[in-house]
Amino acid sequence: MNDPEQYEPSSSTESVLMPPPALPQYFQRPAAAPQVYSTLEPSVQNLRSSLHKPLTGNQQQFVQKTLENVQKNPSQDDTHEFINQLADYPPTIPDSVTLHFLKSAGVDGSDPRVTRMISLAAQKHVSDIILDAMTSARMKGLGQTKKGTKDTKYTLTEELLDEILKEYGHQNTRPPYHT
């Protein structure tokens, strides 16, 4: 009984009601093994008959439209549209500041669209850092509430900023005379 290849049901009702225990792939029986499930069981019959049906017209149209959409690659069109719209977008970090830091990093004569994209990426990075710092301040309860209002104001401290910058892989070095 312990040998999986020698498993045989003890009675004829067991072969109809219970499937054999799950076996690893290398213990699987050959394809000519007797059928365990009854041919009268409706759920098995329904599954078998529905497996080999051809697709309906609506299903074929859906598959065709899906293939066309995948082949068009709309994300590439969206990317080109986004890059072209960068010229109309006034960045928070001015182009002159971005160009200065690009030149100091050794990048010369970059495309204005690339400059805008780098400016936008820097803005996103800074906003993520500040959002994380504010979330940390809220979790620590460092806000101040005035008596007349219910608004809580949070102050961004260097200690909070140091924690968040370490998470992002930046090191905030303070001058020795800083208190």
Curated annotation (Swiss-Prot):
GO biological process, one term: transcription initiation at RNA polymerase II promoter
Keyword Transcription applies: yes
Keyword Transcription: yes
InterPro entries attached to this UniProt entry: TAF10 (IPR003923)
Keyword terms: Nucleus, Transcription, Transcription regulation
Pfam families the UniProt entry points to: TAF10
Residue ranges of the region described as Disordered: 1-23
GO cellular component term of the entry, any: SAGA complex
GO molecular function (one): promoter-specific chromatin binding
Disruption phenotype: RNAi-mediated knockdown causes arrested development at 90-100 cells and inhibits differentiation. The two E cell daughters (E2 cells), which form the endoderm, divide abnormally early, immediately after the MS2 cells. Phosphorylation of the RNA Pol II large subunit C-terminal domain (CTD) is reduced slightly in embryos. Abolishes expression of taf-9, perhaps as a result of altered protein stability. Reduces expression of a range of genes, including let-858, rps-5, hsp16.2, and pes-10, but has little or no effect on expression of cki-2 and sur-5.
Locations listed in the record: Nucleus
UniProt subunit comment: Component of the TFIID basal transcription factor complex, composed of TATA-box-binding protein tbp-1, and a number of TBP-associated factors (TAFs).
Function: The TFIID basal transcription factor complex plays a major role in the initiation of RNA polymerase II (Pol II)-dependent transcription. TFIID recognizes and binds promoters via its subunit tbp-1, a TATA-box-binding protein, and promotes assembly of the pre-initiation complex (PIC). The TFIID complex consists of tbp-1 and TBP-associated factors (TAFs), including taf-10. Essential for early embryonic development, but not required for transcription of some genes; probably acts via activating transcription initiation by RNA Pol II, as part of the TFIID complex.
Family in the record: Belongs to the TAF10 family.
Listed name of the protein: Transcription initiation factor TFIID subunit 10
